[in-house]
UniProtKB/Swiss-Prot annotation:
Coiled coil: none annotated. Keywords: Cell inner membrane, Cell membrane, Membrane, Symport, Transmembrane, Transmembrane helix, Transport. Gene3D superfamilies: Sodium:dicarboxylate symporter. Pfam families: SDF. The gene is dctA. This is C4-dicarboxylate transport protein. One of its GO terms (biological process) is L-aspartate transmembrane transport. The lineage of its organism: Bacteria, Pseudomonadati, Pseudomonadota, Betaproteobacteria, Neisseriales.
């Protein structure tokens, strides 16, 4: 009975799919690369649902608030937390890369590097300033924001719409109820889509190994090893300390979201687990309004794994090219990254684009050095995405506790003995509850 239950669990299925993808990509590279549409298709299916779910969650959460000032407080606390923690991520990346020096001794001449492959990234890096990013949050069309999957634009519209419904009083209640019912249906649909997660993870992993090969990692293994180690240190030390002060264990939280982490590992996209993550955070005891505001905002402003990557990659390039940087120059890089990492948020390939934008503003490090890490960037994206997911999970729980919007007893109970995900969806229709339970558990 236990083996049957394990066999049917999403956790087990995704692990098996990832292993099969690695084996296919390694032994049959051509067949592995042909599996790319499976991974792309799954990610597109999930992204199709993200903006409607964010809209429903935020609207219902805000419209149900009695104190409208709470929205501003939650947003302000979230942004403050994001800035502090991403700064710590940048600093810990700086410390580790200076201690381990993965690029030392490579003695690369920037003039010999092929910059053709990075041209599209450096071009995009110059296209969007911080001002452009802020203006981009305001959509030209609400329909366009939903159609193009612009999370921050949808979040802005959702906040305004939720405020409006709240101000309407009783006359706005039917609309709120309709949006809440739509939310239940959307989560049920996500349950159906998540049945395909093993297929998506298999396709994405088979493509990655088939195209780049395991052997391609050896030349830059030092940087990759240093980066993965730093991500673990950040989760264990920085996020672990934060969660300890808040009264719970980071490792119990990681275990609680293990299915979401495996989906992210297989697809290299932290967005692929966003709908399930939002449902689980509500189940964990966080109020819907806090989840709806913090999680979507965090996906643009609280990218801890990306922050670690940016610092380490920039200093690695300098080390590889034999460039000695002073402490002032390294701190300047961190200051620039605090700005540029926000300016490129939400852009496809944002990590590489942000790095290009940063190097363009720091004359001491050649932009051509990006060509050094282009080949292994795909292999480091898994650690970036996993760390981003854990970071945003912690951020939501911490902000909820800070705002007294967290049921601590429920948090402790769920971390000790997690219940099926459907319980966190608060689905009122009995037939829908059964359907969601079958598809999400």
């Amino acid at each position: 009975m236990q083996s049957r239950k394990l066999y049917k669990s999403l956790y087990f299925q995704v692990i098996v799919a990832i292993i099969c993808g690695v084996l296919l990509g390694h032994f049959m590279p051509d067949s592995g690369t042909a599996m790319k549409p499976l991974g792309d298709g799954f990610i597109k299916l999930v992204k199709m649902m993200i903006t409607p779910i964010i809209f429903c969650t935020v609207v219902v959460g805000i419209a149900g608030m009695e104190d409208m000032k709470k929205v501003g407080r939650v947003g302000g606390k979230a942004l403050l937390y994001f800035e502090v923690v991403t700064t710590l991520a940048l600093i810990i990346g700086l410390v580790v890369v200076n201690v381990l020096k993965p690029g030392a001794g490579m003695n690369v001449d920037p003039a010999t590097l092929d910059t053709g492959a990075i041209a599209k990234y450096t071009a995009k890096a110059g296209e969007q300033s911080v001002v452009d990013f802020v203006l981009h949050i305001i959509p030209n069309s609400v329909v366009g924001a939903f159609a193009e999957g612009e999370i921050l634009q949808v979040l802005l519209f959702s906040v305004l719409f939720g405020f409006a419904l709240s101000m309407m009083g009783q006359s706005g209640k039917p609309v709120v109820k309709l949006v809440e019912d739509i939310s239940h249906a959307l989560f049920a649909a996500i349950g159906f889509i998540m049945k395909l997660a093993p297929i998506g993870a298999f396709g994405a992993m088979a493509f990655t190994i088939g195209k780049y090969g395991v052997s391609s990692l050896s030349s830059l293994a030092a940087l990759m090893g240093s980066f993965y180690l730093t991500c673990l240190l950040f989760i264990g030390l920085v996020l672990g300390t934060i969660t300890r002060f808040c009264g719970f264990s980071i490792w119990k939280l990681v275990r609680y979201i293990k299915e979401e982490l495996l989906i992210v590992l297989g697809t290299s996209s932290s967005e692929s687990a966003l709908p399930r993550l939002m449902a689980k955070l509500e189940q964990l005891g966080c109020q819907k309004s806090v989840v709806g505001l913090v999680v979507p905002t965090g996906y643009s402003f609280n990218l801890d794994g990306t922050s670690i990557y940016l610092t380490m990659a920039a200093i690695f390039i300098a080390q590889a090219c034999g460039i000695e940087l002073t402490l002032t120059q390294e701190l300047t890089i961190i200051g620039v990254l605090l700005l540029t990492s926000k300016g490129a948020a939400g852009v496809t390939g944002s990590g590489f684009i942000t790095l290009a934008a940063t190097l363009a503003t720091v004359p001491d490090i050649p932009v051509a050095g990006l060509a050094l890490i282009l080949g292994i960037d795909r292999f480091m994206s898994e650690a970036r995405a996993l760390t981003n997911l854990v970071g945003n999970t912690v951020a939501t729980v911490v902000v909820a506790k800070w705002e007294n919007a967290l049921d601590s007893d429920k948090l402790a109970a769920e971390l000790h003995n997690p219940t099926p995900l459907a319980h966190g969806l608060k689905v009122e229709a009995p037939h829908l509850t059964r359907e969601v339970s079958r598809t999400l558990s």
